[in-house]
Amino acid sequence: VLVHLQHLGSWAKAEVVAKAGVPAIVFAPVGTAFTRQVNLFSRKPGVHVISSLETKAVEQALRMVRAKKQFAETRLLVVQGDKREETVMEHLGTKVRRIPRDTYHELFQKMPETEEAHEIAKSMRKGAKDIIEPSKQDTINAARSFVTAKHLLKMEESNAITTDCLGMVTTQVVPTPPCMAATLFQDGGVTYGCEADVFGAMSLMLTSYLL
């Protein structure tokens, strides 16, 4: 519930909402909120008090509410290890699906150098200020990683991904790191986290959901 206070004497109405146990955002413009009113009230569970003249602060608070819903509707794909399982994160409700790491690099090996991959590689090389080490084939392989991850997300009905990148590179099961793929995903507003780090991926996801 969004409560917009317009008078210093309106806090009793906000108290009614708080006592009802309904999560509330209380917008109290400067002049309607002083220490006596805010000190204890702002510490009540489920209450977020905004004392500002800027209504954008309300918009940001509502984005946080929206982000909570988005987390609950998200499935994060974790590519690591050799087991398949799915759990649900406490409080946030995000589904975390773990699949064997082999799934990724085996799909990569089957992924042809599609026109999409060539176009992505061409675009990345064209947009680069300078190219020090990667060969043309390196960028094509990096683009294949992007296409592979897209297919994997679709196959697993997931909205975000984090992979055991270093593990795949050090064991040489993929020819290039998936870093460019991660960059392209992030640019598109889709989370691609590094090193199969669930909490790192969740942090990336939060920044996307708050935009």
Mark where each language-model region is.
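An N-terminal assembly and electron-transfer interface module characteristic of large anaerobic redox
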Residues: 1-211
